[in-house]
Amino acid sequence: MSLLQFSGLFVVWLLCTLFIATLTWFEFRRVRFNFNVFFSLLFLLTFFFGFPLTSVLVFRFDVGVAPPEILLQALLSAGCFYAVYYVTYKTRLRKRVADAPRRPLFTMNRVETNLTWVILMGIALVSVGIFFMHNGFLLFRLNSYSQIFSSEVSGVALKRFFYFFIPAMLVVYFLRQDSKAWLFFLVSTVAFGLLTYMIVGGTRANIIIAFAIFLFIGIIRGWISLWMLAAAGVLGIVGMFWLALKRYGMNVSGDEAFYTFLYLTRDTFSPWENLALLLQNYDNIDFQGLAPIVRDFYVFIPSWLWPGRPSMVLNSANYFTWEVLNNHSGLAISPTLIGSLVVMGGALFIPLGAIVVGLIIKWFDWLYELGNRETNRYKAAILHSFCFGAIFNMIVLAREGLDSFVSRVVFFIVVFGACLMIAKLLYWLFESAGLIHKRTKSSLWTQVEG
């Protein structure tokens, strides 16, 4: 890449970054937080944060990258995607009418809410316990990270339930919403994330998500300023780099350490070059249609229920890894959101996907605002826990693609909804058995007097 070509790419990158950052800043000033702000920051991180890192790798370490015209296509496709997404998100689908009283879809009380977070936490802890009994601490047993996907590891499906510890702790926080509950959320979820990091053998998702939710709650409540958020972001990048070194068993120093930091940070936070690789091989792609979305559900179907279930699921990430890159190392390489759309339907699917994503984020913000307006604090805690708990799925959306997001968000909704239903059923059984006694002001006053 020549300096002239780099200069042209830099101008496009700068314009796209300023465009998205400016719209995000105005939205932040207006509402301080919503899921449009979160997705916009996530989109910036995924598709634009990596460009400076790639530039240093090219000019400092002479690393090979896709041709400049392909990198330009990747930057422009990301910028156009966001423009269509933003217009869709801001388009009002129906006229605003005065809020009329409606019959609520569901209600929550204190006992049901506490039962819900206990069940969610129980699912996570029991899953971790069973996985540990089968495999021990994989971080200290396996020689390479790719081995966690091999047949040596049993009970892999249990990992999908680990994440429900975070929504459980979110319910606990939203019931109190003070600084102590906020700090307790951080300590408990990060400790759990470190535990799963050691047990699973290097998976950092729970730590990243817990830390991100902690920061956004701090921003919403005014406990964290923007400069503190920036400092925490730098600390998070360094922390994720250190965990990556431990995961891959690397011991580096000097220029090698700087080089390793650049490419691991780029691959962890901003795999935008994967989109460029996909566009470089555009003519070799056999468009998959909506099949990757259907196939991604296969991993949630137990083999005893479907004996003939394919052992290898050809979703967009695996198609990109196996068919496009001819990589059979055992690790799936993230195609990114835009890349998954290209795999499914080519360039035509990029604006269509942007419209779909705009509607998805609009729905989450509607649910979040519903929680903000809710007068029943127990129901509000459940709604907010669901919304913030889905942050993991939004990260999957930006990094892995639309197909992975759809299957995971459906799984999340089913499990979360099942926990709600079980909590309500248990409450009904306890109440029928006479074990539930409603609190009254007089009884509470008597306890205080005594």
Curated annotation (Swiss-Prot):
Q: Which residues cross the membrane?
A: 6-26, 37-57, 63-83, 118-138, 155-175, 181-201, 207-227, 228-248, 341-361, 378-398, 410-430
Chief localization: membrane
Where, subcellularly, is it found? Cell inner membrane
Q: In which pathway does it act?
A: Bacterial outer membrane biogenesis; enterobacterial common antigen biosynthesis
The processes (GO biological process) annotated in the record are: enterobacterial common antigen biosynthetic process
- What does the UniProt function comment say about this protein? Probably involved in the polymerization of enterobacterial common antigen (ECA) trisaccharide repeat units.
Summarize the subunit comment. Probably part of a complex composed of WzxE, WzyE and WzzE.
Record-given protein name = Probable ECA polymerase
The species this protein belongs to is Escherichia coli (strain UTI89 / UPEC)
Q: Which gene encodes it?
A: wzyE
